[in-house]
Amino acid sequence: MKRAAVLFLLANLFGCVTVTQDGKPEVKSDPIDMAESRITLGLGYLEQGNMLKARENLEIALKHAPSYYRAQLSIAHYYEQVGELDSARNTYRKALRQHPKNGNILNNYGTFLCKQGEYQQADKYFNKAIDQPYYYLVSASYENAAFCALKAGQTDQAKYYFARTIDHDPNRVRSILQLAKLEIEAGEYTEARIKLMQIHQRYGLQKPSLQLLIQLEKAAGNKSLQIKYQNQLDQMMEVS
């Protein structure tokens, strides 16, 4: 009874258990788990700048699980980092053929396309990702779409996407700051001021938000407030 319990536990921890001809149990490792281990190693090497080891581990991950989307995305990311853009594009396309409704692939391919200056196509894939019913990184895709729209010179579209980002994740500070900046540039001072004040209420005084408030009050002609925020920023800089 105890032996059976041990074998059952091994099966749950490591994968499927089969019995060899001599009657001994053989544990087969799960290919996804094996791929994940190699992905972790590969991305770690990539972050360290060891491209040779990164590629080796990411290619092994793909051999363990050729259709596993995280292995596909990881090797595509590697190709991007080393400038093999055709290989990256082909890897993304293959992944999309196999997983056409995977929001992570759609989002990452959109990011890749935006980096190549293919803004319209990138926007299409960001929105496809957002539309997937079981994709939960919607705020990240809206934010990516917003910054891509900025790169394309589509300020109004960017503002819309930043607003949608905040709707889905009110604590996404980068989008709040960027939207406030765009509102200041558009003369929408009240809207921008509210957003920046909310940041201070939630997180305390922050350098980026103070810098924007100084810019805002200068543009609005509020000299006393401009000086107030400048003094707060100066004090913060002295402490740091």
Regions found by a protein language model. Give the residues of each.
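Bacterial Sec signal peptide processing site at the extreme N-terminus
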Residues: 13-34, 240
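Structural marker of alpha-solenoid helical repeat scaffolds
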Residues: 30, 64, 98-99, 132-134, ...
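Residue-level recognition of tetratricopeptide repeat
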Residues: 34, 41, 68, 102, ...
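Canonical tetratricopeptide repeat
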Residues: 40, 74, 108, 142-144, ...
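TPR alpha-solenoid repeat register
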Residues: 71, 105, 139-141, 175, ...
